Each structure stands twice: as C-alpha cells, then as structure tokens.
C-alpha cells in the first residue's frame, strides 16, 4: 500500500485520528508561543505532512499515532525518528520534525500520549498525562515506532533517532535495544543508559549536553568512559552558557546561537551516517 500525504496543521482534526481519541487532541490552532516560534510551516512546499497510525504490540494500547513528514520527491529517504520531551507531541517537536524533513529526511514524531487522547494542547497537562503512563510500555511504543519508520516504504532502510530531555534518554536506550538496526543517534540532554548495556550499542552517536544541567551531566563522565572502553563510535559536545532545554525555541531556556550550532551538527551527522 502506498502512503498518501496531506498537509495538515499541527494538532488538526484529521481522518488519520482514531475514532475514540478525545476532543483534547483536536485543537487546530497553535498556542500563541508556538505560533510565534514556528520555523517551518506545514504548508511549506519542500515537505508533505500527515498523521499516521500503526501497530505497537506490547505498548500502552497496541496502537500508536505519529506525525510523519516527508521531503518533496519520491524517495526513498533516510529516516529519522524525533522523540518528544516528557509532555507529548507538542508543536515544537512537530516543527523540529518538519525541519528534519526539509533537510531530506523522512521524519516521524510519535506521540506517546496518543493512546490516552494525544497531546492535550498545553505542556502542563501533557506532562501530567505522560507521567501517568507505564514507562516500560512507553519505551516499547518507541521501539515499535522506530521499526515502523525503518521499514516504511519511503525509507532507504537507514535509521537515525534524535530526542530531547526525556526523548534524549530514549534515544540512548534505543541504541542499546536496536543494536545494528539503528545507524545513528543524537540525544539532546538525555539520561545515559546503564553502563552495563553500552556494549550492545552499534549506532554512531553524537551526544549533546547543556553546560548547566547537573542532573543529566552527573552521568556524563561514566557514559563517556564506558563508550571509550567499548570502542564505540561517538562524539560528545557541551554547549557553553546553556541550560537543559536550550534547543526549544518556545521557552525562556532557548539559546539561539548554540541551538543553531547543535542542529547544524545534528543534520550533518545524520547525512554522514544515513546516506
């Protein structure tokens, strides 16, 4: 079956939604701060966007929904999974997904809240909703999302993953669990995986840290040492003058200069390892 794309606004009602999803996820207007910080419109001629549903056996509900964005053209394209923070698929992450597609990647942003109604329209409620879910099943949903994207008809079979905060930690652990099925990962200020699991990583990693992020950075040296001892292909960057969340241009923690550098490095890294 060939995938068809229909450009739809972020969080718009669409025919791709499950019938039992709540009205909370049906808002078709961006929150003011998100509208002001959007960098790539869903109507941009360089991309095509749609929401997709796919199976997720063993996950929260057995089904998942994600925001799939393809570059213009027929493909196949290298694939990049974009994993949100701990508050669901908000407009910031949807914009990041469109940014990746503009660079030539088939990009998918799963919404971990989709089994219970989807992103509710504000980050505060989204955070409460995500906290209520089983973390093990959430991770299974991300594993299934990665496999869905890698095997998509428009994918070239090469898989990368990037994520932010909670999503950064997921990227690190996807590298452990997927092994050779994941080619590259770029976690932003995410929790490191267990040291004993590092040997399982086969993906190339670019690990991005904020300078002022004590909780996440507490494991950095241990993570670096384990990667070196296991002879993994990786690079780590720390961005001067930044705090946790510095890439998110919809919050006060945004650091425009360093976010630009980090994103350019991310795209270059994926182009190198996923082509």
Task: Name these PLM-found stretches.
Residues 1-46:
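N-terminal targeting or regulatory segments adjacent to alpha/beta-hydrolase or S9 domains
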Residues 112, 190, 239-241:
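Active-site loop/turn elements of alpha/beta-hydrolase fold enzymes
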């Amino acid at each position: 079956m060939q995938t068809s794309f229909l450009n739809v606004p972020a969080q718009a009602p669409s025919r791709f939604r499950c019938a039992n999803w709540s009205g909370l996820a049906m808002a078709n207007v961006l929150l003011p701060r998100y509208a002001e910080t959007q960098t790539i419109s869903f109507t941009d001629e360089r991309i095509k966007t749609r929401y997709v549903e796919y199976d997720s056996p063993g996950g929260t509900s057995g089904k998942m929904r994600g925001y799939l964005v393809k570059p213009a053209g027929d493909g196949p394209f290298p694939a990049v999974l974009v994993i949100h923070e701990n508050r669901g698929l908000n407009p910031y992450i949807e914009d990041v997904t469109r940014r990746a597609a503009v660079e030539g990647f088939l990009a998918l942003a799963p919404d971990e809240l989709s089994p219970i109604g989807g992103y509710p329209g504000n980050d505060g409620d989204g955070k409460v909703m995500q906290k209520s879910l089983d973390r093990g099943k959430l991770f299974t949903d991300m594993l299934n999302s990665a496999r869905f994207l890698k095997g998509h008809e428009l994918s070239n079979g090469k898989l990368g993953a990037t994520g932010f905060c909670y999503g950064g930690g997921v990227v690190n652990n996807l590298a452990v669990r997927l092994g050779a099925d994941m080619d590259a990962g770029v976690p932003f200020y995410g929790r490191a995986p267990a040291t004993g699991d590092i040997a399982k990583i086969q993906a190339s990693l670019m690990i991005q840290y904020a300078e002022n992020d004590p909780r996440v950075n507490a494991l950095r040296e241990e993570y670096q040492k384990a990667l070196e001892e296991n002879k993994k292909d990786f690079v780590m960057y720390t961005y001067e003058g930044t705090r946790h969340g510095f890439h998110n241009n919809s919050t006060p923690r945004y650091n425009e200069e360093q976010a630009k550098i980090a994103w350019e490095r991310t795209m270059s890294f994926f182009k190198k390892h996923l082509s």
